[in-house]
Amino acid sequence: MMQTKFIIQMTLETRPDLEYFYCGEGKSGAQVFELKKSRAKKYDTMEEVNRDAFILQAVHKASGETYTVLPIRCRT
């Protein structure tokens, strides 16, 4: 979990353009995945962010990697 917190902090510092992302802790370590607003629309609620994070989590699970998902809204 410390690795995840470190990666979240680094993402906040190095990617100020990211409004939404989720951090996954999987078998191969922690990783940050961008939730691309441009793909569909701007998110209005955290429920929409969580839904997309859940969909992406399912995609990674299909590839054999399992992530514990922490959705984060880092900008207001």
Where do the protein language model's features map onto the residues?
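Short aromatic-glycine-(Arg/Gly/Cys) micro-motifs in beta-strand/loop hairpins
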Residues: 2-39
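Short, mixed-charge low-complexity intrinsically disordered segments
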Residues: 39-76
